[in-house]
Amino acid sequence: MSVYRCFVEKKQPFATEANGVKSDLKIALLNDNVNNVRVINRYDLENIDEEDFKMAERTILSEPQVDALYEQAPVAEDDEWVLAVEYLPGQFDQRADSASQCIQLATMKEKPEVRSARLYYIKGNLTEEDKEKIKKTLINPVEAREASLEKPETIHQNYEKPALPEILNGFIDLDEAGLEAFR
């Protein structure tokens, strides 16, 4: 199956998160180089048919009254810089999990695989130093990373099965000399 992708952005005046990010970035940069910020949620879905995807993007992934829905990422203007942020593999993505569960309930079919990312369209006269500060402000390296803007062939992730840990027999019975030798 192929990967379906859509982009969802809050319309003005509902884009309160984008306004908050703009304020945070102005404080972090200690300058007025940021003129505007747009926050766009990106959804990648797999194991879903096109009809169900079309239904989901209009009823689950977006709210037509307050959201603008795009099939392709909006093109950045000349003075706009785009930063995409996604959760690290293994980190729980509540937005994606909630979307997946809702789609399964709505379609009464197999649960689709969903990945989400957040795209920040930052408009202004930004230096490379500003961009690095913005990355440090918007990306918590413990849980997230910079995401690719390219559409993947698949969103399914395979992980190697880790080796079993070594079993230490008699460890609990070691005295101080035994613990020192074990070190």
Enumerate the language-model features and the residues they cover.
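Core nucleic-acid recognition elements
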Residues: M1-R183
